[in-house]
């Protein structure tokens, strides 16, 4: 029976999703390099003698283990074990496999010629055949997502597997890690686990480079916990470096309270807070083609984040106990941790928090300046480096923890060095002035005091959201520990009630003692 217009449209959409996600078959498998234009032959046990390809293009036999196959001498390569069919199909001119095999099905959906190894006959791979095959995929099984057990359509299953493939591709090739704090190692292990297992932890930088060199693998580092010269040593040794940092939607609680991250970024080119060199995020924002489907996700994600009052450390946060003067512009000035890497590298104008306050006051001498110290500073665990003689520049200093989202609803403008609060303000439609060079500056969305000449593209807010929240970070579902989408983590964070452990409570108490011994802005 011919497919209806609706069925054809849905079949075309499924094929398009599969191509984009590159899932199906053992997509997590190995990726050997083959001769371009070759034939891959995947016999089924007992079928091998039913078809023997003729000599011509190079032929690679793909089997579970070394077989006794009656092939007649045209086999330059033997492929064994789990392999990524998408990588294989990028290189082939033809596939020989049983008609119901994943390799054959994917090849036909891609329009690659397939010969049924059982019958020896070619299988149709024209548009009509591809649509019919896609419709069979749509109708056949029932799919359930692993987070709630609820039934989902095949398209959603493809999207979910696409997230898992992106996760595996991001951490692929990492063989050793160094600089991960002990309390977060188990969580980082979950993030970095790939096809080859968990990358081992090295005790020294020398050991990390030796292991990576032996394995011909990359080393994952936490940049602030390795010597500055480490990357130069790695480059001299030919060892790739993957830099790991917290993601932009981190967790329902602070890292200084030992709450493990539910999101990280893994950057092979640089790091998002260092404007002196490109990063994977900067390249993505500069070059990626953002398809309409992705931008629709970005719009929905942004609206959910804003409506739930979410930020880097989850939801909630009490509104500040302050009434802003109605006859003055209100400017929120965001403080940061003085020795944070993003400040040390991105505060191009210099001066730290004090310089930020001075410039904000010079920019708006008649405005009401509200200064918000960083949560880690208010917790008592980190320092702000704000000189006491600059306190008078602010009309009010928020010396008690309060939510950022409620503040962003009532202020007229936000001034930052490199703080992620500037990005959160953009999500909520605020005017943002960047005194440093954070990842979201230089794309035409902020008022910038410094420039990053590499950033020439003009982005929409939703393109920025798509790159920074949907494509750059990795996420783990807090309930199952499985890789998940940004939308899944946002749903979890929106409904999360922080349940501090004994260790978390002890860290909170320790911070209160430290805070009692010094001003929150010190």
What are the roles of these predicted feature ranges?
Residues 1-522:
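Catalytic-core helical/loop segments in enzymes performing group transfer/polymerization on anionic/lipid-linked
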């Amino acid at each position: 029976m011919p497919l209806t217009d609706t069925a054809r449209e849905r079949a075309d959409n499924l094929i398009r999703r599969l191509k984009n996600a590159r899932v199906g078959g053992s997509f997590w498998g190995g990726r050997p390099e083959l001769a371009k234009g070759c034939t891959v032959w995947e016999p089924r046990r007992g079928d091998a003698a039913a078809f023997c390809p003729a000599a011509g293009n190079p032929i690679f036999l793909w089997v579970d283990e070394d077989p006794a196959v009656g092939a007649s001498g045209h086999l330059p390569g033997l492929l064994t074990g789990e392999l990524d069919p998408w990588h294989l199909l990028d290189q082939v001119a033809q596939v020989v496999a049983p008609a119901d095999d994943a390799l054959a099905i994917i090849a036909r959906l891609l329009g690659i010629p397939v010969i049924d190894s059982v019958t020896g006959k070619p299988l149709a791979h024209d548009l009509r055949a591809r649509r019919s095959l896609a419709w069979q995929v749509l109708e056949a099984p029932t799919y359930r997502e692993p987070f709630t057990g609820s039934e989902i359509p095949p398209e959603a299953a493809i999207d979910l597997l696409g997230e898992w493939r992106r996760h595996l591709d991001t951490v692929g090739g990492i063989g050793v890690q160094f600089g991960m704090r002990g309390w977060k190692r188990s969580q980082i292990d979950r993030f970095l686990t790939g096809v080859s297992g968990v990358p081992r932890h090295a005790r020294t930088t020398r050991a990390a480079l030796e292991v990576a060199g032996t394995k011909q693998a990359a080393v994952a580092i936490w940049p602030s916990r390795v010597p500055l010269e480490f990357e130069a040593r790695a480059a001299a040794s030919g060892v790739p470096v993957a830099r790991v940092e917290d993601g932009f939607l981190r967790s329902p609680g602070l890292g200084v309270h030992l709450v493990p991250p539910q999101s990280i970024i893994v950057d092979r080119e640089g790091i998002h807070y260092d404007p002196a060199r490109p990063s994977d995020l900067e390249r993505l924002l500069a070059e990626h083609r953002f398809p309409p489907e992705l931008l629709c996700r970005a719009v929905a994600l942004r609206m959910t984040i804003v409506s739930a009052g979410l930020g880097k450390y989850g939801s909630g946060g009490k509104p500040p106990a302050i009434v802003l003067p109605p006859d003055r512009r209100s400017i929120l000035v965001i403080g940061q941790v003085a020795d944070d890497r993003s400040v040390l590298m991105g505060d191009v104008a210099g001066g730290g928090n004090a310089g930020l306050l001075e410039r904000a006051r010079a920019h708006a001498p008649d405005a009401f300046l509200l200064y918000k110290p960083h949560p880690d500073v208010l917790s008592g665990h980190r320092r702000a480096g704000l000189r006491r003689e600059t306190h008078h520049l602010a009309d009010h200093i928020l010396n008690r923890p309060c939510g950022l989202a409620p503040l962003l609803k009532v202020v007229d403008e936000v001034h930052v060095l490199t703080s992620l609060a500037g990005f959160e303000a953009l999500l909520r439609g605020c005017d943002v002035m960047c005194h440093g060079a954070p990842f979201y500056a230089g794309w035409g969305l902020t008022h910038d005091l410094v420039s990053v000449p590499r950033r020439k593209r003009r982005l929409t807010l939703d393109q920025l959201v798509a790159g920074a929240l949907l494509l750059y970070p990795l996420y783990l579902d807090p309930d199952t520990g499985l890789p998940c989408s940004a939308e899944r983590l946002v749903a979890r964070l929106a409904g999360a009630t922080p349940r501090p452990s004994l260790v978390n409570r002890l860290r909170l108490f320790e911070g209160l003692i430290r805070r009692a011994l010094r001003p929150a802005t010190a």
